[in-house]
């Protein structure tokens, strides 16, 4: 109703006051989407980059040949900034005359939980990021998978549940089928200690389950010959995410080393995989493993292989992509699962916004309405 009220009030104003305005329209979600994109563009246009420097070290323990990376963090136990090359060179001069000593070692086990199954917004976001699909394309393919695909020996089969939903609810039958598949294919150790139940956010219309395969035991590889390329990619994305959501967490052995170098403090950190858990099927994140020495101890004197100053400039915020715009709308409680894709299509078709690669950029018209 709010969308209609806003549209009725604003659209006549646009028609009267902007050339060519008879083709213009406004609605609550549409207006917010354009406003977010325009505000971001203004931030980018007004952004003034600032110079700063960092110093990286490559260190190794005595008798070791492999080096590990550490970053300068503190001076006199406080965070500090290096603003220019002159300051960076002054710090380097001090560092070259002092020993590098391990001042602290922290070890821990970190647990990483799988992401929940998809809802409409997260499916659109992930398909954009991982598959390069625009939201309209994602929803069209999801509709095809939902309505049914001819599978040899089975006839027309709906392969995924309804794709317009904001609920994370999963039926007990689907959860049990996923657990059975996981145990058969990966082993009992890949099952969590208790069944995974995900809570939906408030104000959710719980008429439909989360987006999941209708038959969790029907792995994507079995369907590759009867699906189009796009259908296969999206089904695999939905299937992988759902099965992974019902798997055990990944476990990492983490190490953090503090290094004293005169008045300066460096830090090095890294991890090794203790148990891959759900990531055997659905890896995500951009963490990098590190060659941190496993047996480093407080008091160890380290050999300096390299000290490297690096110049940086602060960067403006990135333009919205479809994925990040949908996420922003969802986080601000704007719109419903069924509206995200049509809204993006509308603001582009009305020439308020245009695509520049994956980015969404306001047009000159979008900047003034």
Residue ranges and their predicted role:
Residues 1-107, 143, 210-267, 272:
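Phosphate-backbone binding and catalysis cores of DNA-processing enzymes
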Residues 7, 27, 270-280, 335, ...:
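Glycine-centered small-residue hotspots that permit tight backbone geometry or close packing
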Residues 12, 32, 275, 338-340, ...:
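Basic, gly/Ser/Thr/Pro-rich low-complexity segments located predominantly at protein N termini
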Residues 60-62, 151-152, 273, 352:
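Short polar/acidic secondary-structure junctions
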Residues 77-79, 170, 275-278:
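A short local loop/turn or secondary-structure capping micro-motif enriched for an aromatic residue
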Residues 84-236, 242, 246, 250-254, ...:
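Structured DNA-binding interfaces in DNA transaction proteins
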Residues 264-293:
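Polybasic, glycine- and aromatic-enriched phosphate-binding surface used to engage nucleic acids
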